[in-house]
Curated annotation (Swiss-Prot):
It comes from Pseudomonas putida. SUPFAM superfamilies: 4Fe-4S ferredoxins. Pfam families: DUF3470 (PF11953), Fer4 (PF00037). [3Fe-4S] cluster binds at C9, C17, C50. Residues 2-30, 31-60 form the 4Fe-4S ferredoxin-type domain. The gene is fdxA. The lineage of its organism: Bacteria, Pseudomonadati, Pseudomonadota, Gammaproteobacteria, Pseudomonadales. The keyword Membrane does not apply. The keyword RNA-binding does not apply. This is Ferredoxin 1. Binds 1 [4Fe-4S] cluster. Binds 1 [3Fe-4S] cluster. [4Fe-4S] cluster binds at C21, C40, C43, C46.
Amino acid sequence: MTFVVTDNCIKCKYTDCVEVCPVDCFYEGPNFLVIHPDECIDCALCEPECPAQAIFSEDEVPSGMENFIELNAELAEIWPNITERKDALPDAEEWDGKPGKIADLER
């Protein structure tokens, strides 16, 4: 089991979750974070820290967002590891809660 970052992180990229991760399993893209499924220890510390409520246990990923399970695994292999909190993206508050942001994902 692992945790998964989903759609609402895109264009927000709050990094509160990164700070609490005991195994540093977050990876950072231009406008999105992902969790490496082979490194996550399922501790659940990150989930309540996400202001965008974009992190879910793999077995609780909302319907229609199952593609994020594979996407997290794929992008964690190519993006750099992030271990410290950074400022959210400038328009994070504007984008928080907007549906269908997968088209805005920058690889």
